Regions:
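Terminal leader/tail segments of proteins
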Residues: 1-107
Length: 107
């Protein structure tokens, strides 16, 4: 296991099977290395700092597909055809579901 610290409250944990972003002790997103599918959980605070780190996590580690939604209504976005604006839009839409207005700094 390897751990990369993004800031004092956010870490990325690398294991044999997945790469996971944590905010404090809560899992935010997990990328499964075998199938390259990423699940984004609902169990986090959607703070601006966490959203920014999720954006950076997606941009750096998600190279194939991102899984959006809950079973049975799951959509897959193919990251080879997605640019940073699309990633930002995805995160913004998820945040707006939870009432977060200011989402990410422009990058």
């Amino acid at each position: 296991m390897k751990i990369k610290t993004l800031n004092p409250n956010h870490v990325v944990v690398f294991t044999e099977n997945n790469i996971t972003l944590f905010s404090y002790d809560t899992e935010v997103a997990s990328l499964f290395c075998d199938g390259m599918f990423l699940g984004v959980t609902d169990a986090w605070d959607y703070s601006n700092v966490t959203l920014k780190n999720l954006y950076l996590f997606l941009r750096e580690y998600c190279t194939d597909y991102i899984r959006v939604g809950k079973e049975p209504n799951v959509n897959l976005l193919h990251f080879n055809e997605v640019d940073n604006k699309a990633i930002k839009k995805f995160i913004t839409q998820r945040a707006e579901e939870y009432g977060v207005k200011k989402v990410l700094e422009n990058r």
